[in-house]
């Protein structure tokens, strides 16, 4: 179970392994935890995917919302909590980690806040028995030693992470101001990108896109 329009990589793996993908709509600009859980419970789903903060919206849920969602995960189901952008959430809003909770596995990366996308360093936080199951199917293309050393060094330099957070916040504010000056609005973001609401329909959004391209600004089409 996932949200209709959410980050698509989860979908590819479900399809690749012959699974059935079920989707539920967003609630405004946010993924809808209750709707995801209701659908999972109704369909007896094995996996539920939620990104917090969300890609592509950039919005996020407060810690209490996510912690409540984890507590309500149906029996026999696992919540895949994508926290790729967790380093950018407002102070105090990241949900606490209970490493012994077998209802959730948290996916994180050094590609965003730590700026190490080329090193391909990702990791999961989960209960020991759950993580142990992955050892049975883990392939031999593991993370290289240089990437591991870089990740450990990055963890030791929290001053740099704070600098990156500050720079990203400035960038979001700049993009928001540019949008405002052109009669557009931005969605609140806890990521290193900003979603711009063009405020009308798809035709107008396409016109904005075309004008950006005409002015030498490349915009990657979503998914």
Regions found by a protein language model. Name each.
Residues 89, 127, 156, 199-200:
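Residue-level recognition of strand-loop junctions within catalytic nucleotide-signaling folds
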Residues 103-180, 184-187:
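PLP-dependent aminotransferase class I/II
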Residues 26, 169, 179-215:
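Conserved PLP-binding catalytic core of the aspartate aminotransferase-like
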Residues 22-24, 47-53, 79-83, 188-190, ...:
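Short beta-strands and strand-loop turn motifs
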Residues 1-50:
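PLP-dependent aminotransferase-like
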Residues 15, 31-43, 56-79, 83-116:
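Active-site pre-lysine segment of PLP-dependent enzymes
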